[in-house]
Design a protein with these regions (language model features):
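Glycine-rich phosphate-binding loops at beta-strand->alpha-helix junctions
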Residues: 271-289
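Glycine-rich phosphate-binding loop plus the immediately following alpha-helix
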Residues: 81-89, 100, 107-108, 115-151, ...
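Short beta-strand-loop/turn "lid" adjacent to the catalytic site in phosphate-handling enzymes
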Residues: 34-79, 97, 105-116
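Phosphate/pyrophosphate-binding loops at sites that engage ATP/ADP/AMP, CoA/4′-phosphopantetheine
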Residues: 30-44, 142-146, 259-271
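Short glycine-rich, Thr/Ser-proximal phosphate-binding strand/loop in the N-terminal lobe
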Residues: 1-21
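Short beta-strand scaffold segments in enzyme catalytic cores
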Residues: 1, 161-165
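Adenine-nucleotide phosphate-binding core of ATP-dependent small-molecule kinases
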Residues: 213, 217-268
Length: 289
Protein backbone atom coordinates (compact mmCIF):
# COMPACT_ATOMS: atom_id res chain seq x y z
CA UNK A 1 0.00 0.00 0.00
CA UNK A 2 1.32 3.43 -0.98
CA UNK A 3 -0.04 6.43 0.89
CA UNK A 4 0.68 10.14 0.80
CA UNK A 5 -0.94 13.32 2.00
CA UNK A 6 -0.36 17.01 2.52
CA UNK A 7 -1.61 19.98 4.47
CA UNK A 8 -2.73 22.97 2.40
CA UNK A 9 -2.26 26.00 4.64
CA UNK A 10 -4.58 29.00 4.68
CA UNK A 11 -1.74 30.95 3.06
CA UNK A 12 -1.61 28.46 0.15
CA UNK A 13 -5.31 28.90 -0.53
CA UNK A 14 -5.92 32.55 0.27
CA UNK A 15 -5.82 33.75 -3.37
CA UNK A 16 -8.75 31.48 -4.32
CA UNK A 17 -12.07 33.31 -4.00
CA UNK A 18 -14.28 30.21 -4.32
CA UNK A 19 -13.53 26.58 -3.55
CA UNK A 20 -14.32 25.58 -7.14
CA UNK A 21 -11.32 27.64 -8.24
CA UNK A 22 -9.09 25.18 -6.35
CA UNK A 23 -9.96 22.30 -8.68
CA UNK A 24 -6.90 22.46 -10.94
CA UNK A 25 -4.59 23.20 -8.00
CA UNK A 26 -5.72 20.13 -6.05
CA UNK A 27 -6.01 17.87 -9.11
CA UNK A 28 -2.52 18.75 -10.32
CA UNK A 29 -1.14 18.21 -6.81
CA UNK A 30 -2.52 14.66 -6.72
CA UNK A 31 -1.29 13.80 -10.21
CA UNK A 32 2.13 15.21 -9.33
CA UNK A 33 2.33 13.03 -6.20
CA UNK A 34 1.54 9.94 -8.24
CA UNK A 35 4.09 10.86 -10.91
CA UNK A 36 6.82 11.49 -8.33
CA UNK A 37 6.11 8.09 -6.77
CA UNK A 38 6.29 6.42 -10.19
CA UNK A 39 2.68 5.23 -10.01
CA UNK A 40 0.95 5.10 -13.43
CA UNK A 41 -2.70 6.14 -13.82
CA UNK A 42 -3.84 2.53 -14.20
CA UNK A 43 -6.51 1.59 -11.67
CA UNK A 44 -9.42 -0.84 -11.39
CA UNK A 45 -11.47 1.79 -9.56
CA UNK A 46 -11.09 5.26 -8.07
CA UNK A 47 -12.90 6.28 -4.88
CA UNK A 48 -13.03 9.75 -3.36
CA UNK A 49 -14.31 11.59 -0.37
CA UNK A 50 -17.93 12.61 -0.90
CA UNK A 51 -19.23 16.17 -1.04
CA UNK A 52 -22.07 18.34 0.22
CA UNK A 53 -24.90 16.64 -1.63
CA UNK A 54 -28.47 16.07 -0.49
CA UNK A 55 -28.88 14.14 2.79
CA UNK A 56 -28.26 10.44 2.22
CA UNK A 57 -27.72 7.23 4.21
CA UNK A 58 -24.18 5.98 4.64
CA UNK A 59 -22.78 3.84 1.85
CA UNK A 60 -20.87 3.75 -1.45
CA UNK A 61 -22.23 5.65 -4.47
CA UNK A 62 -21.19 5.68 -8.13
CA UNK A 63 -20.23 9.11 -9.48
CA UNK A 64 -22.53 10.27 -12.28
CA UNK A 65 -23.29 13.47 -14.18
CA UNK A 66 -26.05 14.57 -11.80
CA UNK A 67 -23.74 14.19 -8.82
CA UNK A 68 -21.03 16.23 -10.53
CA UNK A 69 -23.53 18.97 -11.41
CA UNK A 70 -24.81 19.10 -7.83
CA UNK A 71 -21.26 19.38 -6.47
CA UNK A 72 -20.29 22.15 -8.89
CA UNK A 73 -23.43 24.10 -7.94
CA UNK A 74 -23.52 23.17 -4.25
CA UNK A 75 -25.10 25.72 -1.92
CA UNK A 76 -22.30 25.17 0.60
CA UNK A 77 -18.58 25.58 -0.09
CA UNK A 78 -16.01 22.99 0.94
CA UNK A 79 -13.03 21.32 -0.70
CA UNK A 80 -14.78 17.95 -0.30
CA UNK A 81 -17.00 18.99 -3.21
CA UNK A 82 -13.99 18.56 -5.49
CA UNK A 83 -13.17 14.97 -4.54
CA UNK A 84 -15.69 13.28 -6.84
CA UNK A 85 -14.77 15.61 -9.72
CA UNK A 86 -11.08 14.74 -9.44
CA UNK A 87 -11.84 11.03 -9.04
CA UNK A 88 -14.06 11.09 -12.12
CA UNK A 89 -11.35 12.73 -14.24
CA UNK A 90 -8.77 10.22 -13.01
CA UNK A 91 -11.11 7.28 -13.66
CA UNK A 92 -11.79 8.43 -17.22
CA UNK A 93 -8.06 8.47 -17.92
CA UNK A 94 -7.83 4.75 -17.18
CA UNK A 95 -11.33 3.63 -18.15
CA UNK A 96 -12.46 2.47 -14.71
CA UNK A 97 -15.47 3.29 -12.49
CA UNK A 98 -15.41 6.08 -9.89
CA UNK A 99 -17.17 6.19 -6.52
CA UNK A 100 -17.63 8.18 -3.34
CA UNK A 101 -18.19 6.67 0.11
CA UNK A 102 -19.97 7.97 3.23
CA UNK A 103 -20.22 11.61 2.10
CA UNK A 104 -20.28 14.47 4.63
CA UNK A 105 -24.08 14.65 4.30
CA UNK A 106 -24.74 11.15 5.68
CA UNK A 107 -27.97 11.68 7.63
CA UNK A 108 -28.95 9.14 10.28
CA UNK A 109 -30.09 11.59 12.98
CA UNK A 110 -32.71 10.47 15.46
CA UNK A 111 -35.91 12.58 15.32
CA UNK A 112 -35.25 14.46 18.58
CA UNK A 113 -31.86 15.61 17.26
CA UNK A 114 -33.44 17.53 14.38
CA UNK A 115 -35.43 20.07 16.40
CA UNK A 116 -34.35 23.59 17.29
CA UNK A 117 -36.21 26.32 19.16
CA UNK A 118 -37.16 27.97 15.85
CA UNK A 119 -39.63 25.91 13.76
CA UNK A 120 -38.24 27.26 10.48
CA UNK A 121 -34.73 25.99 11.32
CA UNK A 122 -34.00 22.26 11.51
CA UNK A 123 -30.66 20.79 12.51
CA UNK A 124 -28.92 19.03 9.64
CA UNK A 125 -26.25 16.34 9.55
CA UNK A 126 -22.94 17.50 8.07
CA UNK A 127 -19.85 15.85 9.51
CA UNK A 128 -16.74 13.85 8.71
CA UNK A 129 -18.74 10.71 7.99
CA UNK A 130 -16.17 8.87 5.88
CA UNK A 131 -13.36 9.03 8.41
CA UNK A 132 -15.64 8.66 11.44
CA UNK A 133 -17.26 5.49 10.16
CA UNK A 134 -13.97 4.07 8.83
CA UNK A 135 -12.15 4.39 12.16
CA UNK A 136 -15.21 3.02 13.96
CA UNK A 137 -15.17 -0.10 11.79
CA UNK A 138 -11.42 -0.43 12.26
CA UNK A 139 -11.77 -0.17 16.04
CA UNK A 140 -14.62 -2.68 16.07
CA UNK A 141 -12.55 -5.18 14.06
CA UNK A 142 -9.61 -4.70 16.45
CA UNK A 143 -11.72 -5.96 19.36
CA UNK A 144 -13.43 -8.72 17.39
CA UNK A 145 -16.79 -7.01 17.03
CA UNK A 146 -18.92 -5.39 14.33
CA UNK A 147 -19.48 -1.62 14.12
CA UNK A 148 -23.21 -2.30 14.40
CA UNK A 149 -22.72 -3.87 17.85
CA UNK A 150 -21.11 -0.83 19.49
CA UNK A 151 -21.98 2.57 20.90
CA UNK A 152 -19.14 4.98 20.15
CA UNK A 153 -18.35 8.67 20.45
CA UNK A 154 -16.13 9.62 17.53
CA UNK A 155 -14.22 12.91 17.58
CA UNK A 156 -12.82 14.04 14.23
CA UNK A 157 -10.21 16.74 14.81
CA UNK A 158 -9.31 18.55 11.61
CA UNK A 159 -9.92 21.91 9.94
CA UNK A 160 -13.45 21.32 11.17
CA UNK A 161 -14.33 19.31 14.26
CA UNK A 162 -17.23 16.88 14.50
CA UNK A 163 -18.27 14.87 17.54
CA UNK A 164 -20.77 12.14 16.78
CA UNK A 165 -22.82 9.61 18.72
CA UNK A 166 -22.61 6.29 16.84
CA UNK A 167 -25.38 3.99 18.06
CA UNK A 168 -25.03 0.47 16.65
CA UNK A 169 -23.89 1.61 13.23
CA UNK A 170 -25.94 4.80 12.91
CA UNK A 171 -24.85 8.35 13.77
CA UNK A 172 -27.91 9.43 15.74
CA UNK A 173 -26.54 12.85 16.73
CA UNK A 174 -23.59 14.97 15.62
CA UNK A 175 -22.77 18.66 15.41
CA UNK A 176 -22.92 20.39 12.03
CA UNK A 177 -19.16 20.66 11.63
CA UNK A 178 -19.37 23.04 8.68
CA UNK A 179 -21.86 25.78 9.39
CA UNK A 180 -21.65 27.05 12.94
CA UNK A 181 -22.43 24.35 15.48
CA UNK A 182 -20.44 22.55 18.14
CA UNK A 183 -16.79 23.22 19.04
CA UNK A 184 -14.85 25.96 17.31
CA UNK A 185 -11.99 24.60 15.24
CA UNK A 186 -8.95 25.69 13.22
CA UNK A 187 -11.23 27.20 10.53
CA UNK A 188 -14.81 27.19 11.91
CA UNK A 189 -16.58 29.39 14.42
CA UNK A 190 -18.68 26.63 16.01
CA UNK A 191 -21.63 27.53 18.21
CA UNK A 192 -21.73 31.26 18.96
CA UNK A 193 -24.10 33.49 20.98
CA UNK A 194 -27.12 33.94 18.69
CA UNK A 195 -28.13 37.45 19.76
CA UNK A 196 -24.65 38.89 19.35
CA UNK A 197 -24.31 37.21 15.97
CA UNK A 198 -27.66 38.64 14.84
CA UNK A 199 -26.44 42.13 15.79
CA UNK A 200 -23.23 41.58 13.82
CA UNK A 201 -25.16 40.36 10.75
CA UNK A 202 -27.31 43.50 10.67
CA UNK A 203 -24.55 45.96 11.57
CA UNK A 204 -24.13 46.91 7.93
CA UNK A 205 -20.40 46.13 8.09
CA UNK A 206 -20.47 42.74 6.37
CA UNK A 207 -21.94 41.05 3.31
CA UNK A 208 -23.68 37.68 3.55
CA UNK A 209 -20.63 36.02 2.00
CA UNK A 210 -18.32 37.64 4.57
CA UNK A 211 -20.54 36.50 7.42
CA UNK A 212 -20.60 32.94 6.10
CA UNK A 213 -16.81 33.01 5.85
CA UNK A 214 -16.68 33.94 9.54
CA UNK A 215 -18.55 30.72 10.27
CA UNK A 216 -16.61 28.53 7.86
CA UNK A 217 -13.17 29.32 6.51
CA UNK A 218 -12.07 32.32 8.53
CA UNK A 219 -13.37 31.49 11.99
CA UNK A 220 -11.85 29.63 14.92
CA UNK A 221 -8.07 29.58 15.29
CA UNK A 222 -7.56 31.55 12.07
CA UNK A 223 -9.72 34.38 13.41
CA UNK A 224 -7.94 34.44 16.77
CA UNK A 225 -4.36 33.65 15.77
CA UNK A 226 -4.10 34.23 12.02
CA UNK A 227 -3.16 30.61 11.28
CA UNK A 228 -4.75 27.16 11.12
CA UNK A 229 -1.43 25.36 11.70
CA UNK A 230 -2.28 23.42 14.86
CA UNK A 231 1.17 21.81 15.12
CA UNK A 232 2.79 25.23 15.35
CA UNK A 233 0.13 26.55 17.73
CA UNK A 234 0.45 23.49 19.98
CA UNK A 235 4.23 23.90 20.11
CA UNK A 236 3.80 27.47 21.33
CA UNK A 237 1.03 26.48 23.73
CA UNK A 238 3.22 23.79 25.26
CA UNK A 239 5.79 26.49 25.98
CA UNK A 240 3.09 28.55 27.69
CA UNK A 241 3.10 31.26 25.02
CA UNK A 242 -0.01 33.44 24.90
CA UNK A 243 -2.42 33.94 23.27
CA UNK A 244 -1.73 30.55 21.64
CA UNK A 245 -2.16 28.49 24.81
CA UNK A 246 -5.33 30.25 25.91
CA UNK A 247 -7.04 29.98 22.52
CA UNK A 248 -6.03 26.37 21.85
CA UNK A 249 -7.03 25.25 25.34
CA UNK A 250 -10.39 26.98 24.88
CA UNK A 251 -10.96 25.14 21.60
CA UNK A 252 -10.19 21.80 23.24
CA UNK A 253 -12.53 22.70 26.11
CA UNK A 254 -15.39 23.11 23.62
CA UNK A 255 -14.53 19.70 22.14
CA UNK A 256 -14.67 18.05 25.57
CA UNK A 257 -18.05 19.66 26.25
CA UNK A 258 -19.39 18.22 22.99
CA UNK A 259 -18.15 14.75 23.97
CA UNK A 260 -20.12 15.07 27.19
CA UNK A 261 -23.24 16.00 25.23
CA UNK A 262 -22.93 12.87 23.09
CA UNK A 263 -22.90 10.76 26.26
CA UNK A 264 -26.48 11.96 26.78
CA UNK A 265 -27.44 11.02 23.20
CA UNK A 266 -26.20 7.48 23.90
CA UNK A 267 -27.90 7.41 27.34
CA UNK A 268 -24.55 6.92 29.04
CA UNK A 269 -23.93 3.59 27.30
CA UNK A 270 -20.59 4.21 25.57
CA UNK A 271 -18.15 1.47 24.59
CA UNK A 272 -15.32 3.79 23.54
CA UNK A 273 -14.32 7.33 22.61
CA UNK A 274 -12.30 7.50 19.40
CA UNK A 275 -10.09 10.45 18.45
CA UNK A 276 -9.17 10.82 14.77
CA UNK A 277 -8.14 13.46 12.24
CA UNK A 278 -4.93 15.43 11.85
CA UNK A 279 -5.04 17.10 15.27
CA UNK A 280 -5.12 13.66 16.91
CA UNK A 281 -1.40 13.44 16.06
CA UNK A 282 -0.73 16.25 18.57
CA UNK A 283 0.29 14.91 21.97
CA UNK A 284 -0.57 18.29 23.50
CA UNK A 285 -4.13 18.29 22.16
CA UNK A 286 -4.82 14.64 22.95
CA UNK A 287 -3.40 15.10 26.43
CA UNK A 288 -5.58 18.13 27.06
CA UNK A 289 -8.69 16.23 25.99
Amino acid sequence: IWAAGAHHSSEDLQHFHHVNEQYEYRRDFIFRLLAEAGIPIEFDAVIARGGLLKPTPGGVYAINEQMKYDLLHARMEHACNLGALIADEMAKKCGCPAYIADPEVVDELQPAARYTGIPEIERISIFHALNSKAVSRKYAASIGKHYEELNLIVVHLGGGISVGAHCQGRVIDVNNALNGEGPFSPERAGTIPADQFAELCFSGKYTLRQVKKMLNGKGGLIAHLGTNDVASIAHKAEAGEEPYKGVLDAMLYTVAKQVGAMYVSLRGKVDAIILTGGIAHSDYCVGAL
